């Protein structure tokens, strides 16, 4: 795919009629049915994502409709989730910062062959409000809350600690040219608010909040990282020091440092 016609269709001037795609029909159906719909783009980085997905990125950002052929427009409803699978090799393309800023990057590790074959894989058991997680349309107003509205969800002690942690990572990444702005901060905060609801809104949210912030460090802050030893070597050292309470992110940074030492260059997705 190199342009959005492969997702949204196009106007066939020979037949003088629109040519629709399965993705278009799914989106139109999701506008009529108020249960969750998922648009899954397999191997979405076989082409430059920005070339065929730019209209979606703009619509997600602005909450406006996607202009189509003629005067037609396409609404992206709140009950539609877009998921893309990605492989990184010599046949694929990396994502731009614009795409990474608007997504949660979830990395799936290769499991042990022995554990898989003997069915000894670790399986976490959810211990929070599972029904809240199962219905992704729950608490939709959270998506539109401003940072000041989100602040009111938490107690002052947590908010001070949380904002200090975000600032710490923002400053470290900014030094190397990988800083993040309001959009990323808002999305991280919404994620934390959803986690707080999943945890049944504990009166004092102490150590357990760090597991969710750990996920957001890895999914929202680190994915843009790439460069040579000179560019990000010191940054990785500072991040490693700051991630002692965040084991998932700490392990990722150690992995990146090892690759950097061997190859003199590293990116988040190796």
Region locations from a protein language model:
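AAA+ P-loop NTPase catalytic core and its hallmark functional loops
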Residues: 1-135
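Alpha-helical lid/collar subdomain of P-loop NTPases
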Residues: 123-270
